Design a protein with these regions (language model features):
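Intrinsically disordered, low-complexity segments enriched in polar/charged residues with Gly/Pro
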Residues: 1, 47-48, 75-77
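N-terminal capping segment at the start of a domain
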Residues: 1-25
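A non-catalytic alpha/beta surface segment that caps or lines the substrate-entry region
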Residues: 20-69
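Active-site metal-coordination/substrate-binding segment of hydrolases
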Residues: 55, 69-110
């Protein structure tokens, strides 16, 4: 079951972080903390940041199986946002998030 309150709080926290390409360290650190709290048995950060000139690598999180015989699932996403992602203040209108109009929402994978 989805914890809607936690989902909204996490979304709002993530979109407020300034994270242009090659500057995703703050998002990376936050995701590591949240993945650990969700029960990841292993969290790996690769060296892609140093190879590509960024300040963080790709994250790989492993969660233990919770049922026998079910297939594995992989989720992928990126942590950066287009350059105009500074000063984002998301607004919830009904069930839809929007920007206030001065910025993008910057939520494509967040």
């Amino acid at each position: 079951m989805v914890n809607e309150k936690r989902m909204r709080e996490t979304f709002e926290e993530l979109v407020r972080i300034y994270a242009p390409s090659k500057g995703e360290r703050e998002v990376c650190d936050l995701l590591k903390k949240k993945l650990k709290a969700l029960g990841a048995s292993e969290i790996i950060e690769d060296n892609n940041g140093s190879v590509e000139g960024g300040d963080s690598g790709n994250l790989i999180a492993v969660f233990p199986a919770n049922a026998e015989g079910l297939p594995s699932v992989a989720l992928t996403a990126h942590m950066d946002c287009v350059e105009c992602c500074r000063g984002i203040d998301p607004v919830l209108e009904g069930s839809v998030y929007r920007s206030r109009g001065e910025t993008i929402l910057g939520s494509d994978d967040k």
